[in-house]
Amino acid sequence: MTTLCLNMIVKNESKIILRLFDSVVNIIDCYCICDTGSTDNTVELIKTYFENKNIPGKIVNEPFKNFCHNRNFSIRSCLGMSDYILLLDADMLLQIYNFDKNTLRNFDSFYILQGNDNFYYQNTRIVRNNGLYSYVGVTHEYLNTPSNNKTGLINKTELFILDIGDGGSKQNKFE
């Protein structure tokens, strides 16, 4: 069976993070979340939620430097935990329809449609957990893929990322 690790960077997301977890709990096998300096109870919520669901994982701490640095730190921290990594943010909701994780084996990375009812676009949100993927760019970061990467598209009838945009640290995004 193909395994999937939830991977994120978070800071002060206690008001919304459980909503995301509830949306992914049925397809993830583990989690690796990088906290960049939460001062609320985000870390405690993460631990308690996944302990109650018997989902293994870890929280790593790395002070926020920039999105590229922290996302790469987070990805490196989950190396060896799963076959694939699911890259999400706390202010998203993963809508799962007709999705079989075992189909992931056919490709190295996957576009998932992301957005809202009026506008959506393809974004690489699942990658093979092999240490070959990294982010580039300080603020408007993008995923750098290996030259021999085979990318698949997950149809909107299988998965869709609803980008709600109400993250807890939007107001102090660069602190």
Give residue spans per PLM region.
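Cell-envelope/extracellular polymer assembly enzymes that use nucleotide-activated donors
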Residues: 3-5
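Short, well-formed alpha-helical segments that are part of the catalytic scaffolds
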Residues: 7-30
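Short beta-strand/loop segment that forms part of the nucleotide-sugar
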Residues: 8, 29-37, 58-62
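Residue-level preference for short helical/loop micro-motifs built around acidic side chains
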Residues: 15-18, 40, 44, 69
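A structural alpha-helix within SAM-dependent methyltransferase catalytic domains
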Residues: 21-25, 32, 47, 75, ...
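A conserved acidic beta->alpha catalytic loop
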Residues: 23, 33-46, 63-64
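Conserved donor nucleotide-binding strand/loop of the catalytic core
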Residues: 44-73, 77
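Catalytic-site signature of metal-activated, phosphate-bearing donor transferases
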Residues: 67-76, 82-88, 92-175
